[in-house]
A protein has these predicted regions:
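AMP-binding/adenylate-forming catalytic core of the ANL superfamily
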Residues: 76-79, 86, 145, 192, ...
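Conserved AMP-binding/adenylation subdomain of ANL enzymes
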Residues: 2-36, 43-87, 100, 104
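Gly/Ser/Thr-rich phosphate-binding loop
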Residues: 56-59, 83-88, 98-164, 168-175, ...
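General small-molecule cofactor/ligand-binding pocket signal
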Residues: 62-64, 141, 321-324
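Short hydrophobic "strand-cap" motifs at the C-terminus of beta-strands
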Residues: 39-40, 89, 118-119, 143, ...
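Short beta-strand-to-turn element immediately C-terminal to the catalytic PLP-Schiff-base lysine
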Residues: 4, 152-157, 177-178, 197, ...
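Structural motif corresponding to alpha-helix initiation and N-cap regions
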Residues: 71-72, 125, 183-184, 257, ...
Length: 329
């Protein structure tokens, strides 16, 4: 290889490179090679896209041997393989991961882990803080997007600098628009639909109606609008509210289940929670919380409603409670 370097080109002195050095560059030095464990199913976009990206970069992709997610098995494999990256999908994975670490302090050598990444489901600030307490050298990447709208937003967390739940930096091709196609101004407090432009799918196969609803022309540009509602903070960051198709209408007020679920999960007696709307003769719908409690405790509707009310508007507090053994996520 002959290449005139900037500092030596005028002198006619090319830098020398050996064949072994070129081969090492192609293969990638050992310390830069990524070993990724994809804990998420490969049929899910998060697992599939992450695996393809890693393989295209020359990395190694590993799947867990069991058909059902087992956090202890994950940490065993991380230690055995000296994994550098872990791919998961929100709290359904990160909650048992943290519980396993808390129950087995110091059991695993996790010094190889450089990053943990998630997309497709909520990942709370509190859980991120807990995981980083056990793996302080790692970075956490929390991405917001969908199969038809990749790259809507992202947040990064490190030990002592955990990003807020459902708060994201907007991607370069992302905007937030009202239903009539007007762009939402930062800091206005106005709600809008998150949209992304750029490389987009042609549409949904044999579903012209859904394609027309999702892929829209706004400001002379084609956008993918999957249906997620958000506000734009004054600093330009995005506050995700939730998917409009599951929005609960109670007495004319819109309530996004995700924000109520997030509040419920902050209660000490709640391990997991799902919020749904149930028919109500007066308000049209009322908020029902389905809760999986921590072991040995039984939360009441009164205490959970008061807890949610302390963080959100009163009409967003659950009016009905169902306690189950497991949410099953």
């Amino acid at each position: 290889q002959v290449l005139g370097a900037g500092g030596n080109a005028a002198l006619g002195i090319p830098p020398a490179t050996s064949i072994p050095e070129l081969i090492e560059r192609i293969q990638g030095p050992e310390h830069l090679r990524a070993t990724m464990i994809v804990a998420a199913p490969l049929m899910h976009g998060t697992g599939q896209f992450s695996a393809i990206i890693s393989l295209n970069g020359g990395g190694t992709v590993c799947a867990l041997p069991s058909r059902k997610f087992d956090a202890v098995e994950l940490w065993n494999e991380v230690e055995r393989l000296k994994a550098t990256n872990i791919v998961l999908v929100g709290l359904a994975f990160s909650t048992p991961m943290l519980e396993a670490l808390e129950a087995n302090p110091g059991r695993w050598d996790l010094s190889s882990v450089r990053s943990m990444s998630s997309s497709g489901s909520m990942w709370s600030q509190e859980n991120k803080r807990g995981l980083l307490g056990h793996i302080p050298q790692a970075m956490i990447a929390d991405s917001f997007g969908s199969s038809e709208a990749v790259g809507l937003g992202a947040s990064a967390s490190a030990a002592g600098m955990e990003a807020q739940t459902a708060a994201f930096m907007l991607g370069p091709n992302t905007g937030v628009f009202t239903e009539d196609g007007r762009r939402v101004e930062p800091g206005s407090g106005e709600r809008g639909l998150v949209a992304v432009s750029g490389f987009l799918p042609m549409g949904y196969y044999k579903d012209e109606e859904k394609s027309a609803k999702t892929f829209r022309i706004m400001e002379g540009v084609r956008w993918s609008v999957p249906g997620d509602w958000a506000e734009v903070n004054a600093d330009g960051t995005l506050k995700l509210l939730g998917r409009g198709s599951v929005c609960i209408n109670t007495g004319g007020e819109k309530v996004f289940p995700e924000e109520v679920e997030e509040a419920l999960k902050r209660h000490a007696s709640v391990r997991d929670a799902v919020v749904v709307g149930v028919p109500d003769p007066r308000f049209g719908e009322r908020i029902c919380a389905v809760v999986e409690p921590e072991a040995g405790v039984l939360p009441t509707l009164a205490e959970l409603s008061a807890h949610v009310h302390s963080q959100l508007a009163g009409y967003k507090a659950p009016r009905e409670l169902v306690v189950v053994d497991t949410i099953g996520q």
